[in-house]
Design a protein with these regions (language model features):
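N-terminal [4Fe-4S]-dependent radical SAM core
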Residues: 2-32, 45-52, 171, 176
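Core AdoMet radical
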Residues: 45-60, 72-87, 105-119, 129, ...
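Extended interfacial segments that mediate partner engagement and assembly in macromolecular machines
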Residues: 66-72, 76, 82, 90-94, ...
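Surface-exposed amphipathic alpha-helices with a cationic face
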Residues: 93-109
Length: 177
């Protein structure tokens, strides 16, 4: 069952990368959402903190994004921001992630300034998380910055296997070398 964005989405996005090799393993299609209230010091996406930044995620944009994801060259999807877990003004992000899983079954990675524990305690955020395969959680902390870390910026951030964590009811980390 296709669950499409109907009408006007309230969610804005800052950027789409058709082929991205920096935000996750292998070649990915990446969506940067707009809007974040964490205001992490030294945030590298300051312009994307405004919920007014960027363009609305329309039906046409959703279809274009999915066409990129369906490319045989694309291994998975990365969702960053802004803050994906603050996109609760409507269900546009949830619908997009659901379509990605239903139509492509490709791996979804999501970066959030919230911890896993904070996400699962909020029903709307948990519903989004249930569509995700890998979560990079926690706010960027400048005092814990480590440029040698893969896929994250500070040592407090974790790379979490979401499916195993939900099933086992405890955080299951992925060791990325």
């Amino acid at each position: 069952m296709k669950v499409k964005i109907k009408g006007n989405s309230k969610m804005k996005y800052a950027q789409i990368r058709k082929f991205d090799v920096t935000n996750g393993p292998k070649v990915r299609t990446t969506l940067f959402v707009s809007g974040c209230t964490h205001n992490c010091p030294q945030c590298f996406n300051k312009d994307q903190q405004s919920f007014e930044y960027g363009e609305f995620l329309t039906e046409e944009v959703e279809e274009q994004f999915l066409s990129y994801v369906k490319s045989p060259n694309v291994h998975g999807v990365s969702i960053l921001g802004g803050e994906p877990m603050q996109q609760l003004m409507d269900d546009s992000l949830l619908k997009l992630l659901t379509r990605i899983k239903e139509e492509t079954n490709k791996e979804i990675w999501l970066w959030s300034g919230y911890t896993y524990e904070e996400i699962i305690s909020n029903p709307k955020r948990k519903e989004i998380l249930e569509q995700v395969d890998v979560l990079i959680d926690g706010p960027f902390k400048a005092e814990m910055k480590n440029l040698s870390l893969k896929y994250r910026g500070s040592e407090n951030q974790r790379i979490i296997d979401v499916k195993k964590s939900l099933k086992e009811k405890k955080v299951v980390l992925i060791n990325v070398i």
